[in-house]
Amino acid sequence: MVAGKYTIGLGQTKMSFCDDREESPLDKSKSCKTVLMQLFESSGNTNIEGADTFNACYGGTNALFNAVNWVESSSWDGRDALVVAGDIALYKEAAAKPTGGAGCVAMLIGPDAPLVFDVGKRASFMRHAYDFYKADMSSEYPLVDGLLSIKCYLEAVDGCYKAYQAKVATVVPENGNTANGNSASALVDEFDYMAFHAPNCKLVAKSYARLVYNDSISHPESSMFITGLPAEAPDVEYEASRMDKTVESIFMKLSKKRFAERVQPSLLVPTMCGNMYTASVYSSLISIICSVPAAQLRGKRIGLFSYGSGLASSLFSLRVVGDTGKMVNILDLHRRLDARKVVAPETYDSMCKMRERAFQKKNYVPEGDIDELAAGTYYLKYVDEKFRRTYAVKGPSEPSDEISAGQVNGW
């Protein structure tokens, strides 16, 4: 293997993974939301609206939009909404395994939050594609067309960016509407920071460069392009430009400084944990919150690009209007990342085989070692003869507090 194939080629340094003690949704009928309702039993709260929503890596974003729309609607009763996005990224082919990962993000949605949605600044791009899908119910692994998946992702970046630009043009300008409160000729400068869905970190860099490429077409008068583009830029058809290496190289270089300042802070979790599928873009948002000092982040705009194969995608933006310091303290992200245990690749292969043996089994006791789990971690304890699941919570020294029949992921 060539040195740097994954650390440079994919931009990854570490990857989270799971054994058979953790699961991704596997019931074609029962919602994971119904399982999580056990957490509210002690309070007697059964009046909690909502159910699972999914479309590959886009499900969490759809749930987030639903939650925000509920809070803004006539149906809202004054309570907060809770969005839980989590999954396990696992591939059968050896070449794709380094793009795996796992994780879960929970988001509390309500009024007077330190992060607020920009009004009217949300755009989507959706169409039919078979780039990545899970039609084989006998396997946990997806069916993936790798090259098509990259093409679809970049097509979605283009489509969302153009639609977002059209939305911005219809919104009444207001102070602070662009990066640092200045009027920007290039739309990319609308965002002080950006978070992307991150199948791998190198694709994020290419996607940000793609935004700059689009700006070179729509805003050629920007000083960024007058002084930054080579005199003989390649003449490539727009559709072909997505996979053109010369175009990619030019705009990767042109966007390098902006990327380092505005996007690199979002890659802390993705580069350390890998692809979290539906939680990925929100792990990138968390990375920004935990990497940029609260005082520096306040007043800034964060753009988020969410993508799910099949395909569904959206570009939207948030403004930081309050102190994010409390979030940083509660997340305790850096300590939690540092506390993880590093294991050999052979251990990962063993865990993958363990998961294969466990898939769709009943009367099954998982093999994964719970001694390696941190206190407070939920894990699968048993699957009975009717596929009903029992979970437990790892105590300080031994497991305790069983819950049953569902799925809980952790990073």
Language-model features: locations:
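Long, repeat-rich segments with strong aromatic
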Residues: E190-S207
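Conserved catalytic cysteine-centered active-site region
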Residues: M1, C18, S29-D80, N214-S280
